Amino acid sequence: MKRDHHHHHHQDKKTMMMNEEDDGNGMDELLAVLGYKVRSSEMADVAQKLEQLEVMMSNVQEDDLSQLATETVHYNPAELYTWLDSMLTDLNPPSSNAEYDLKAIPGDAILNQFAIDSASSSNQGGGGDTYTTNKRLKCSNGVVETTTATAESTRHVVLVDSQENGVRLVHALLACAEAVQKENLTVAEALVKQIGFLAVSQIGAMRKVATYFAEALARRIYRLSPSQSPIDHSLSDTLQMHFYETCPYLKFAHFTANQAILEAFQGKKRVHVIDFSMSQGLQWPALMQALALRPGGPPVFRLTGIGPPAPDNFDYLHEVGCKLAHLAEAIHVEFEYRGFVANTLADLDASMLELRPSEIESVAVNSVFELHKLLGRPGAIDKVLGVVNQIKPEIFTVVEQESNHNSPIFLDRFTESLHYYSTLFDSLEGVPSGQDKVMSEVYLGKQICNVVACDGPDRVERHETLSQWRNRFGSAGFAAAHIGSNAFKQASMLLALFNGGEGYRVEESDGCLMLGWHTRPLIATSAWKLSTN
């Protein structure tokens, strides 16, 4: 839509807004929220151009970036498709003496931190001739720049210096979260758009993390909460399988829990695992094979798998059970299986599980990334731990994210989750590009969206730290069971298969095992028994 940048006489505000609405036909809604105009039909091309831009920005020599110096900006009219063409042309110019249309801005205008003075966030021009919004942005050194954005002409600035922008990007994310907490949505809306523009100048993990957090903030600001449906559960299962293949976190979770279960079942003739996190049953082939190799022959193995309903009432738990039954037959393990569909673990009752006397059958209860989902419903976690207590298992294995994303204070959980997922995405950067990696990032992005955009019962990604779980389990009548040094050594060997083990770290903490990236623990495996007290 062409606009006159010089004459604003007597244009009706309502008419202008209608014109903008008409102009948005065919535009992607979520990107529009972030301030980008991208037609749905252009999405594939835009994605390809972004990928080309990332490759060129990472490969180009520093000297060749002189035209994109720190003092330089690209003016972005929010038409992302056109802007990408412009950036690609600038980074790969014609051989002729082409001039770059880059505008310099004074150093004082380069902001170190985003904050918006809400008192001057909206100011209508006198006489009604021009509809303007004055926004005052402050930087940490006290320098102030006032920008005036008219409804007739809005020009967004995208700075290209990646390192300095990274600092600004983090400041903008935190400032936006603070504005959301204070319910200052005018400020939050302005900042979330700035985040979108700053994120484009980043490469690698930083850009991906910022984009997911920007989406989550936008959803919270505009109340576009992601839905929770059976289809979402099915999608999450699929994404989790890609995550399992891409990086060692789920493999570590399964391996360490299995080691604790294997040790608890030593010498038992009949064993029963109750899995709170059945999903696709990825954890159990390895345990079954270990049981098959046990001296003196394998025990009778009974598995009870619990999972959420599937779309179209598809019985995926039965299908998983059939696959495991075929494996059991091949490795000569006597196998029994039963699947339970439950909307929530809080619907379970011990009487449903056909428990047998402990002298006949030994039981293990297993939960991987499930218990935190109960924390949004009053009394749910206490009920489930009460059921586990009634089961009287030999061992209760639990794997949870090692981070507190369940603070009642929004800014606290936002800050914690920003650090946590930045580390996780950073650990994925060494993974070769491919479908598994992309789907793993989507898997984590959905978690980010839930932590930031949702509240009440819809917010299920309520991760807590091992120390918080330790207190909760202690109050419910459980005592920690030490996970042996054998598991520690073998887990360390497992990590060597990923990126040569570089960057990953296994730590022992009071009998529990943690897997982290560099100095940051990310997931924790713990084992519990009924307290003798």
UniProtKB/Swiss-Prot annotation:
Region (Leucine repeat II (LRII)): 319-351
Regulation: Transcription activation is repressed by gibberellic acid GA(3) in the presence of TPR4.
Chain location of the short sequence motif DELLA motif per the record: 28-32
Compartmental location: Nucleus
Motif, VHIID: chain positions: 271-275
UniProt PTM comment: Phosphorylated.
The GRAS domain, residue ranges: 160-529
Positions occupied by motif LXXLL motif: 371-375
Summary of the tissues where the protein is detected: Ubiquitously expressed. Expressed in rosette leaves, roots, stems and inflorescences of greenhouse grown.
Gene Ontology MF terms in the entry: DNA-binding transcription factor activity; transcription cis-regulatory region binding; transcription coactivator activity
Region (Leucine repeat I (LRI)): 167-221
Annotated region described as SAW, given as residue ranges: 453-529
An example Gene Ontology biological process: regulation of seed dormancy process
Keywords from the UniProt entry: Activator, Developmental protein, Gibberellin signaling pathway, Nucleus, Phosphoprotein, Repressor, Transcription, Transcription regulation, Ubl conjugation
Induction conditions: Upon seed imbibition, increased GA levels in the epidermis reduce DELLA proteins (e.g. GAI/RGA2, RGA/RGA1/GRS and RGL2/SCL19) abundance and release, in turn, ATML1 and PDF2 which activate LIP1 expression, thus enhancing germination potential.
Protein role: Transcriptional regulator that acts as a repressor of the gibberellin (GA) signaling pathway. Transcription coactivator of the zinc finger transcription factors GAF1/IDD2 and ENY/IDD1 in regulation of gibberellin homeostasis and signaling. No effect of the BOI proteins on its stability. Probably acts by participating in large multiprotein complexes that repress transcription of GA-inducible genes. Positively regulates XERICO expression. In contrast to RGA, it is less sensitive to GA. Its activity is probably regulated by other phytohormones such as auxin and ethylene.
Protein name: DELLA protein GAI
Taxonomic classification: Eukaryota, Viridiplantae, Streptophyta, Embryophyta, Tracheophyta
Gene: GAI
